[in-house]
Amino acid sequence: RGLAVNEIFTQANEKLCENNESGMFVTAWMGILDLATGKLQYANAGHNPPLLKRADGSFEYLKTRAGFVLGGMEGVRYRMGEITLTPGDRLFLYTDGVPEATNTENKLYGEDRLLTFMNQNTSVKAMELLPALKADIDKFVGEAPQFDDITMLIFDYKPQKGGSDMTTRKFPAKVDALSD
């Protein structure tokens, strides 16, 4: 078994801080999900908090400390959080381009509007929810130019018991390795 998520962030931070005279940094959220048990171990490096919807409830922000951005300062130690997902739970991750989308009146889409939208659409399938959210953001911003990316990921947890249907693939750290 490899490193824990917080250890990965600690090591990544040290590497990003090396020779970083320009002061560049990045936010990140990472989780490792055990598909059989639902155990999700995660760490947050200054990223937006994910939204979690339990199978029988509504979306809530995952209560977690944001942690410090990666590449911002040497010697930072990251904390690991852990939750257990149950069948039907849904997790939504997104970049800051979602809540920071700005309309022509210079108003932000915001975390509250995002939470409201998600809770008004709890029965919508995951594959349909992201395009609907993007359409809502586009309607909100209108013709206002945007300066940040919008990246979103959503999944519903469905337990996977071990066996032949389980696949583990390892890729080299090169984008072209993902071509197939």
Predicted regions and their residues:
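Conserved subregion of the PPM/PP2C metallophosphatase catalytic domain
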Residues: R1-A173, A177-S179
